[in-house]
Amino acid sequence: MPRSLKKGPFIDLHLLNKVEKALEAGEKKPIKTWSRRSMIIPDMIGLTIAVHNGRQHVPVYVTDEMIGHKLGEFAPTRTYRGHAADKKAKKR
């Protein structure tokens, strides 16, 4: 269920402060964050945000189509390697 419109988007305060500092300084260095729950806002367009996936920080370049989505949606946490192959079928 989506968040109520009267509440507005959620973004962690420490991440918002980092975004504002990067915009003022004009830095292109990735912003490291562990806040996967924060929503992408229009101020983040053009920035690279390194989102933690539990093991490493995944760089996410923010575009205008991403506004309204959460940062965690763009940093997958699970790696799928496929099911094990059937050994009987390989021998034939």
From Swiss-Prot:
Pfam entry (one): Ribosomal_S19
Keyword Phosphoprotein belongs to the record: no
Record GO biological process: ribosomal small subunit assembly; translation
Role, per record: Protein S19 forms a complex with S13 that binds strongly to the 16S ribosomal RNA.
Record protein name field: Small ribosomal subunit protein uS19
Leader sequence residues: none
Family as reported in the entry's similarity comment: Belongs to the universal ribosomal protein uS19 family.
Entries under InterPro entries matching the protein: Ribosomal_uS19, Ribosomal_uS19_bac-type, Ribosomal_uS19_CS, Ribosomal_uS19_SF
Keywords for this protein: Ribonucleoprotein, Ribosomal protein, RNA-binding, rRNA-binding
Organism of this sequence: Idiomarina loihiensis (strain ATCC BAA-735 / DSM 15497 / L2-TR)
GO molecular function: rRNA binding; structural constituent of ribosome
GO CC annotation, single: small ribosomal subunit
